[in-house]
Swiss-Prot record:
GO terms for biological process: determination of left/right symmetry; dolichol-linked oligosaccharide biosynthetic process; protein N-linked glycosylation; protein N-linked glycosylation via asparagine. It is a single-pass membrane protein. The lineage of its organism: Eukaryota, Metazoa, Chordata, Craniata, Vertebrata. It comes from Homo sapiens. This is Dolichyl-phosphate beta-glucosyltransferase. Pathway: Protein modification; protein glycosylation. It holds the Pfam family Glycos_transf_2. It comes from the Eukaryota.
Amino acid sequence: MAPLLLQLAVLGAALAAAALVLISIVAFTTATKMPALHRHEEEKFFLNAKGQKETLPSIWDSPTKQLSVVVPSYNEEKRLPVMMDEALSYLEKRQKRDPAFTYEVIVVDDGSKDQTSKVAFKYCQKYGSDKVRVITLVKNRGKGGAIRMGIFSSRGEKILMADADGATKFPDVEKLEKGLNDLQPWPNQMAIACGSRAHLEKESIAQRSYFRTLLMYGFHFLVWFLCVKGIRDTQCGFKLFTREAASRTFSSLHVERWAFDVELLYIAQFFKIPIAEIAVNWTEIEGSKLVPFWSWLQMGKDLLFIRLRYLTGAWRLEQTRKMN
């Protein structure tokens, strides 16, 4: 009996090793090059409040605002107004309290099929294009790609990415700012503060099925085991960057869709950029574009491939690249 068990164990180990080698080969051979940092001609401009074209700035220009808010939006004509109303109400009140405070909100329409750009442009007309700008992408790039386009067109010393659904209470940006400041001194002026829902985990578990809870824990384990250490919630769409940290991480990003957050933080940890994880107020909003099982499965595959592609040298981290 013992020899049979030993043989089965050896066979199992051999099959596992063969599977890992095969997956590594697939990861290496299917690895796409880093997406070209290229804008279509139409994406080099925004419309001012009068509907006239103006050239977008670059993240490699000197900052002229204290805060940039980048809002990736795909078919968000219904949910975007709630988020924009809350954000702009807060930002306007803050500016009245402190006239030295300056900001901009950049809505990036990621190839939407609805009226997202028109809805966003109404805020540009109301507040002016110095405060609200709309970038309409020619085709869908994915959430990470849309955020990158917004960040590379920003003017802020600090840059916040915030989801269009308004799930995170916008005034919590102050918590992220404090978290960022607590990380000082910043090496090479780079630091990141991540909004986190980890403190809400017990409450969310009580509302989820056992299967979804199992998927959640499995995903968290894979993130920790394969890519990012010490960050409990990598997926919250509320993150604050110094300008230098944003340019370094987003110029090195390969993944432009759902698992981009994980690669982003993997890159940050590779470059030893300090990261703070800050609890924020978060509410689940109806209309999610994720199908739970398949989205977790896809992201699990992405995590494995992210790790293997860096390990095998298919992907390499480079110095900061500029967009054409």
